[in-house]
């Protein structure tokens, strides 16, 4: 499986299928035709252009209901549930964050924010979504044994580097990829310091990806 980072919390998982998570940047700049789209919560920086794709969208009940009204194909689920779509397993996990929709200037509840454990071609990736640190991340590691953990470190709206490092230790994935940082000034972080701390004090490896860069999970 290959992971391509597209900036903010948007990543592409490419294997037997193409999974786009939390589309954010303009469609013309993504240059990917996903088979499936996963949306962790309803904020505009994560739903983004999801509604413009014809691919099925995996998300929570509230967002799925909203997107169906826009003509989208959806696969609704909720925290703790697992579904298999086109041979790809999606488990929705807890995230500590808010979630709301806006339609024609009217705000609406967007259901619970979430993360995803996604398994494809014998490899497993945990995308934490936007979240604060919570101790049950240990259970995610124990239950699903992800090969890679995608962890937000921007601070202010999610965990910062200190909490992100503890999250990485809780999860225990051999590879950590930081996300959701440096998109704008309020979430600017020194990602090299985060990587150094993990690489020097744990057995895990931190992979820093600039937008457009890829990481391949070796078999």
Curated annotation (Swiss-Prot):
SUPFAM superfamilies: Metallo-hydrolase/oxidoreductase. Disulfide bonds: none annotated. Keywords: Hydrolase. Pfam families: Lactamase_B_3. The keyword Hydrolase applies. Belongs to the UPF0173 family. This is UPF0173 metal-dependent hydrolase Mhun_1705. It comes from Methanospirillum hungatei JF-1 (strain ATCC 27890 / DSM 864 / NBRC 100397 / JF-1).
């Amino acid at each position: 499986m290959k992971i391509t980072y597209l900036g903010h919390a948007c990543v592409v998982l490419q294997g037997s299928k193409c999974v786009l998570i939390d589309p954010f940047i303009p469609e013309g700049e993504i240059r990917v035709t996903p088979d499936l789209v996963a949306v962790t919560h309803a904020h505009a920086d994560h739903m983004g252009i999801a509604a413009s794709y014809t691919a099925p969208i995996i998300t929570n009940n509230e967002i799925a209901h909203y997107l169906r009204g826009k003509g989208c194909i959806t696969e609704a689920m909720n925290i703790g549930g697992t579904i298999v779509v086109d041979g790809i397993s999606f488990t929705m996990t807890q995230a500590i964050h808010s979630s709301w929709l806006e339609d024609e200037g009217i705000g609406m509840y967007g259901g619970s924010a979430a993360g995803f454990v996604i398994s494809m071609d014998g490899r497993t990736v945990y995308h934490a979504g936007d979240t604060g640190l919570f101790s049950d991340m240990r259970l995610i590691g124990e239950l699903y044994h992800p090969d890679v953990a995608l962890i937000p470190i921007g601070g202010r709206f999610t965990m910062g580097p200190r909490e992100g490092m503890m999250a990485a230790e809780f999860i225990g994935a051999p590879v950590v990829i930081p996300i959701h940082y440096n998109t704008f000034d309020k979430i600017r972080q020194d990602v090299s310091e985060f990587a150094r701390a993990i690489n020097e004090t744990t057995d895990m490896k931190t992979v820093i990806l600039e937008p457009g860069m890829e990481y391949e999970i070796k078999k």
